[in-house]
Regions:
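A charged helix-plus-loop insertion that forms the helical arch/lid used to bind
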Residues: 85-99, 171-173
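Residues that line or immediately flank small-molecule/substrate-binding pockets and catalytic motifs
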Residues: 74, 95, 204
Length: 218
């Protein structure tokens, strides 16, 4: 019987669960509150704090039980921009109402519902609206942007070094995915970001192995 560590990041709580491969029964669970940091450049999630929690929890599970695989799930409506230095830009809180200030302008850029199946939602619930607002608010982001990954795959990137996007995350009212063509929607072309997105992978694919240095630490 093998052990699977599940990283489960919700908006209000971050959770690590160790489950067995037979029946997926929980063996151990660790949680900590997740909160929005209300400071410049905009309200954002504490990615660094969550990463410390993840590393400590994985190390504890590995020491007590052993880990054979890691799976990641997160809340939706979030995206991570990675700079040329390999570090993440602050990840915008998708409930930030200031995004609505550019709603009319964004409406001219977003792909039609018939292409994406995404309704036009308030605040940053459409990831495309988040991207438009951030790039308009801070144009310098484009100069330093290296790649964009979906939120679950950000944690996979920290674990493995591999950058990827997942079409199930993109397909969740993001305005960025055309499920009929199984390709990015024209919203990304309007935003000039198609080339920035990490390659799309299936959610059941193995992203990679944990980086050797990190594996030794854990």
């Amino acid at each position: 019987m093998s052990h699977i560590a599940v990283i489960d990041i919700g908006k209000t709580n971050a959770k690590l669960a160790l489950v067995n491969s037979v029946g997926l029964h929980e063996i151990a669970v660790i949680t900590q509150p997740n909160h929005v940091v209300d400071s410049p450049p905009w309200p954002h999630f504490d990615l660094a704090g969550i990463w410390v929690f993840i590393q400590n929890g994985l190390a504890q599970f590995q020491k007590q039980y052993g880990i054979d695989a890691i799976s990641v799930t997160t809340h939706g409506a979030s995206i991570v921009l990675i700079g040329q230095n390999g570090e993440a830009f602050p990840m915008l809180d998708y409930e930030y109402s200031a995004v609505n200030s550019l709603s009319d302008n964004y409406a001219q850029l977003r792909a039609d519902f018939s292409q994406t199946g995404s309704p036009h939602l308030p605040n940053g619930l459409n990831i495309g609206a988040q991207l438009h607002w951030m790039l308009t608010t801070d144009p310098m982001i484009r100069k330093h942007l290296a790649s964009i990954v979906t939120y679950p795959q950000y944690w996979g990137y920290l674990l493995t070094g591999e950058r990827a996007s997942d079409f199930t995350s993109l397909g969740c009212h993001s305005d960025l995915w055309n499920p009929y063509a199984r390709d990015f929607a024209t919203t990304l072309d309007a935003l000039g970001l198609r080339s920035c997105f990490a390659p799309v992978r299936r959610p059941d694919e193995i992203l990679g192995e944990v980086k050797p240095a990190l594996a030794q630490k854990l």
